[in-house]
Amino acid sequence: MVCTSTSSNFYSIAQYILQSYFKVNVDSLNSLKLVDLIVDQTYPDSLTLRKLNEGATGQPYDYFNTVSRDADISKCPIFALTIFFVIRWSHPNPPISIENFTTVPLLDSNFISLNSNPLLYIQNQNPNSNSSVKVSRSQTFEPSKELIDLVFPWLSYLKQDMLLIDRTNYKLYSLCELFEFMGRVAIQDLRYLSQHPLLLPNIVTFISKFIPELFQNEEFKGIGSIKNSNNNALNNVTGIETQFLNPSTEEVSQKVDSYFMELSKKLTTENIRLSQEITQLKADMNSVGNVCNQILLLQRQLLSGNQAIGSKSENIVSSTGGGILILDKNSINSNVLSNLVQSIDPNHSKPNGQAQTHQRGPKGQSHAQVQSTNSPALAPINMFPSLSNSIQPMLGTLAPQPQDIVQKRKLPLPGSIASAATGSPFSPSPVGESPYSKRFKLDDKPTPSQTALDSLLTKSISSPRLPLSTLANTAVTESFRSPQQFQHSPDFVVGGSSSSTTENNSKKVNEDSPSSSSKLAERPRLPNNDSTTSMPESPTEVAGDDVDREKPPESSKSEPNDNSPESKDPEKNGKNSNPLGTDADKPVPISNIHNSTEAANSSGTVTKTAPSFPQSSSKFEIINKKDTKAGPNEAIKYKLSRENKTIWDLYAEWYIGLNGKSSIKKLIENYGWRRWKVSEDSHFFPTRRIIMDYIETECDRGIKLGRFTNPQQPREDIRKILVGDLEKFRINNGLTLNSLSLYFRNLTKNNKEICIFENFKNWNVRSMTEEEKLKYCKRRHNTPS
């Protein structure tokens, strides 16, 4: 390279820009490398200077400053630095290669001036050297890669070596991106100066001698042809309008026919797509309806079977002289509970039998004071949604009734029933000691499909299973099994039902209970607020053996749950619901609800405080504050669409824009790579970018290898053809957008070329093997060692 006075002046100008705009100390100029200058990803048309720290320091780099292009080309630091790049590295000696690119200095030490140069003491009048607005010169003309290759002829070879040898090298990629940016800025600014001869004519003359092939290029000189083409396009539009105004021409009818044919094709395609979606929706609805019908039929059969079992048990007990509690028409048969409960520890049943034996008279007859603890209690009303609609109004308006109206009969004592039925003088062994006693069938954790079905089946009867919350609140023993053999009547205590116990039972249970009050409480429902949480917080399930040892958290005693449905909508709780501000979370005694004399005469009520699961409201407030926080870039924020299913959807969002919003390409051009993205979904952006980058790569490959031979064909049409090919590749191989992006990323990670075509002659889309899909399209999860 021949160093002239003009080029040496630009060396001094480059040193001034680095010191004045990029805030570099004169002592640090020697240590700066070419890879320390990169294209900024935040501000458009900007450069960032930061020095990489190769040692084991705490910071990966030392940041200097970011500088943007100026609208006034005579004061633009990027333009001056670009001219320096053209002079210094248009034909570098030695050439920049993949072996030495990290050692190339940004400024040659021979040209760094350390003496008192008056130029270096000129103060920068614009301290804010970065801008978020693109200059008009970068928007009026976009140079092609061929023009950039005229400025830096060696750049294409370096990029090819990068793709073949070391495509994952970030420094090498940043260097190629830097010279592409410098070439684009040089072409745009020199073209602007050539159109305005009074601006910096000496620089244009000097660069035209330095790279004459650029100024001889037709595309570079195409401003007049662009104007002529615009005028011709305007004349053509005017001619078409005049032809439409004249109804006698045949061309009008032909054009109208062609327009209507194109419109009919689009409508036909859209109608086919809609009909397919409607057919699929109908099939899905039919399958859901079949599932619902099967569930309803199964529930009816289950309910009818339980009623038949209950009627048989009533007849058997009445034939032996005993009796059970007769319920009104709105209640559930008590024998349904025989399929829902489990016997408790036989150690709990023995004292009950002994206590009842002491209460018997000397003649073996049971007195009227015998409590009804041995009768099975009712299952909770909320376990049967279809029956709760008729029972709940009754509970709200239930009034105290006289003793003679409530029909009830005493259960016979176990000893008398057993002796009367079997005639044996020996009492039968208790069933609770059998190792084959029945057990609860716990509810499975709800799945999204079950939740959707539950919302459709609002009036259906739930499966006769005790949920985990009911199990935690219940101490249960098993009842008699057959009409021929009667055992000691067990104790049934179910959350949500009323039952009276003997003094021994109540004293024994109250010792294990963590609560001091003797009230039976239903478990409060957890809130589900869709505005703050996407999924409700599920409480930690407790094993059956540890339920009695669990104590309610202190936060549930001190802080009421403001998010509970009872506090939000008092009308749903009936007429007797507590108003706001009362202890709505405290257990409500069943005796207060039913007003029955049996509950009033009982010496104690079995107490199990339902464990509450408080949810911190601060968690929801943080989420709301996070969603409503408005930053300085809130006006330009764009949330990536979640409705993209095909490559065409990605193409429309990237290049056209959805719902009248700006396209992603436009957002990148205006605001850079980061500022417009919503932080919550910014991690989805690389999966889309790798697909769109591959489409651009295939466009370039198709042009170079002769697939697209028409030079007048717009790149937009070429891009659409490649989008169609990629969509065909995705459909033929049964890939989703995520699996396709994962396929591209895994190939890139393994330094393998991405290609969807069988060959470059007929350009047919290839088919993937199952081994390829398993290797590249499946996510890998680290297995625990």
From Swiss-Prot:
Residues 345-359, 366-376, 528-537, 592-619 have a biased composition (Polar residues). Residues 267-299 are annotated as: Leucine-zipper. Transmembrane segments: none annotated. One of its GO terms (biological process) is positive regulation of ribosomal protein gene transcription by RNA polymerase II. It is found in: Nucleus. The modification Phosphothreonine is found at residue 447. GO terms for molecular function: DNA-binding transcription activator activity, RNA polymerase II-specific; DNA-binding transcription factor activity, RNA polymerase II-specific; RNA polymerase II cis-regulatory region sequence-specific DNA binding. Pfam families: GCR1_C (PF12550). Residues 546-574 have a biased composition (Basic and acidic residues). Phosphorylated in a GCR2-dependent manner. Keywords: Activator, DNA-binding, Nucleus, Phosphoprotein, Transcription, Transcription regulation. The modification Phosphoserine is found at residues 449, 482, 489, 538. One of its GO terms (cellular component) is nucleus. Transcriptional activator required for the expression of glycolytic and ribosomal genes. Forms a transcriptional activation complex with RAP1, RAP1 providing the specific DNA-binding function and GCR1 providing the activation function. Can also bind itself to DNA to a core 5'-CTTCC-3' sequence (CT box). CT box-binding is not essential, but enhances the activation function of the RAP1-GCR1 complex in promoters that contain both DNA signals (only glycolytic genes). CT box-dependent transcriptional activation requires GCR2. Homodimer via the leucine-zipper domain. Forms a complex with a GCR2 homodimer. Interacts with RAP1. Present with 259 molecules/cell in log phase SD medium. This is Glycolytic genes transcriptional activator GCR1.
